[in-house]
Curated annotation (Swiss-Prot):
Keywords: Acetylation, Amino-acid transport, Membrane, Mitochondrion, Mitochondrion inner membrane, Primary mitochondrial disease, Transmembrane, Transmembrane helix, Transport. The keyword Transmembrane applies. This is Sideroflexin-4. It comes from the Eukaryota. It is found in: Mitochondrion inner membrane. GO terms for molecular function: monoatomic ion transmembrane transporter activity; transmembrane transporter activity. The modification N-acetylserine is found at S2. Its main location: mitochondrion. The gene is SFXN4. It comes from Homo sapiens (Human). Belongs to the sideroflexin family. Mitochondrial amino-acid transporter. Does not act as a serine transporter: not able to mediate transport of serine into mitochondria. The chain crosses the membrane at residues 111-131, 133-153, 165-185, 251-271, 293-313. The keyword Protein transport does not apply.
Amino acid sequence: MSLEQEEETQPGRLLGRRDAVPAFIEPNVRFWITERQSFIRRFLQWTELLDPTNVFISVESIENSRQLLCTNEDVSSPASADQRIQEAWKRSLATVHPDSSNLIPKLFRPAAFLPFMAPTVFLSMTPLKGIKSVILPQVFLCAYMAAFNSINGNRSYTCKPLERSLLMAGAVASSTFLGVIPQFVQMKYGLTGPWIKRLLPVIFLVQASGMNVYMSRSLESIKGIAVMDKEGNVLGHSRIAGTKAVRETLASRIVLFGTSALIPEVFTYFFKRTQYFRKNPGSLWILKLSCTVLAMGLMVPFSFSIFPQIGQIQYCSLEEKIQSPTEETEIFYHRGV
């Protein structure tokens, strides 16, 4: 079963889905538009949404939370003093896609990103011997990234399953190729410069992550994504907004993987010069893994918070066919994760 089919066959075709009530506005979209959070508030919000327990929330609990958010007119923000409302918003934002109102597959929810990515990034940055040991971590890393980017991206446009599958395959192949280049260069030429050996994998990991986002979400800039007014009403589909959404996500991934890969390399460089390392050389891998997990643990919510989930764009920047039916000066679009 493909990832797209898995997403569609989730048991949670949730209350208030867009095809059920024409005037319905997705609660998650309403939240991100009305909150207009600062970077600090977005960061704190993401630290809650990235709680690993959000991966295991039951469908029944999510449906009950959605029912509360969809039927209670007084529910407007998780800042409410009511603990039930706070928990309902957390469950909804962490598990439901804003464009389709479908449940996000458990393995590709934002809360699952760090547990999967941290050890995989560590393995992909570790010098290994043998072609299989070099390629397999990169394939897994790039395949998971492509699936995560696609599932959590904007899904407001129509797309054939074959079209999306081909793009996913291209994203995995191209980013994997970029990711393995440093390892093959090292195996063939035996680079000796300490900083070249450390920085080359970081540079190519950044390139691979950027390529992955661009390829897996390129349909957003080709077909266009839905743009909305401040009430959440869809005004049309814009390629310009789609391109902006992809660029913002690409920039956030570069920050995430570049920083998360660079920090462990810097720490290990200085650690290898200490007396403790000379006595305990095996501790290097423990330190590097710990640094990778800690760096990604900080950088995942940081990178997800750089840009708002619901971005803004001036109406005069959009296509003429969208400008004409509205007098709004600020238009909104779902950027995706």
